[in-house]
Design a protein with these regions (language model features):
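Non-catalytic, mobile gating and regulatory segments of ester bond hydrolases
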Residues: 1-122, 126-153
C-alpha cells in the first residue's frame, strides 16, 4: 500500500498519521481506517504515546508530539543532555527517555503484527524525534527494516 505511493502521497499520508497521533483512540481508529489501516493500537506509558496502525501490507508507527499542557512532554523537550544511542552516537536525553518508555511494547507488538509487512515511523515535534530514535533502535537492536518519514516543525 504505502510503497506504491509517490513521495508526495507518502508525505501527505504521514502528515495525516502524525496528526492522528494526537487524537483519542476512538477517533484515531476511525481516521486510520479511512486511510486503509485495519488495526489501531495505542501504547501510552507514563506520558509517552505511540500509535501503531496496521494494514494488510504495512505497519505505521506514529509518535505523538509535544502537548503544551502535558508537563511530561515539556520536561522531555527540556532535558537536553546527551545520551548514548544504540548506534554509538549522542542523542537528546529527553527524547531517548520517551522512547525508552514505549519501546518494549512497540517491539513486542511489531513481532506479532509486522510479519512480512513494511514498517514506517513518523511523528511531529517531540513525536518526530521519537520516531527517529525508535526507528534507529528497531533497526540496530532488533534487525527490523524501518522506513522513517518525519513530520517535524
Amino acid at each position: 500500500m504505502i510503497n506504491e505511493l509517490s513521495l508526495k502521497e507518502k508525505r501527505v499520508l504521514f502528515a495525516k498519521l502524525a496528526g492522528i497521533a494526537y487524537r483519542d483512540v476512538k477517533d484515531a481508529r476511525h481516521a486510520a481506517k479511512l486511510l486503509g489501516f485495519t488495526k489501531t493500537v495505542l501504547i501510552d506509558i507514563e506520558g509517552a504515546q505511540t500509535y501503531v496502525f496496521t494494514s494488510k501490507t504495512d505497519c505505521a508507527i506514529a509518535c505523538r508530539g509535544t502537548e503544551p499542557s502535558e508537563m511530561n512532554d515539556i520536561y522531555a523537550d527540556l532535558e537536553i543532555f546527551k545520551a548514548d544511542s544504540v548506534s554509538g552516537n549522542k542523542i537528546h536525553q529527553g527524547f531517548k527517555e520517551e522512547v525508552d518508555k514505549v519501546y518494549d511494547e512497540v517491539e513486542k507488538l511489531l513481532d506479532r503484527v509486522a510479519i512480512n509487512k513494511d514498517i514506517w515511523a513518523c511523528g511531529h515535534s517531540l513525536g518526530g524525534a521519537m520516531a527517529t530514535i525508535l526507528a534507529q533502535r528497531l533497526e540496530y537492536k532488533d534487525g527490523h527494516d524501518v522506513d522513517t518519514l518525519l513530520i517535524a516543525t
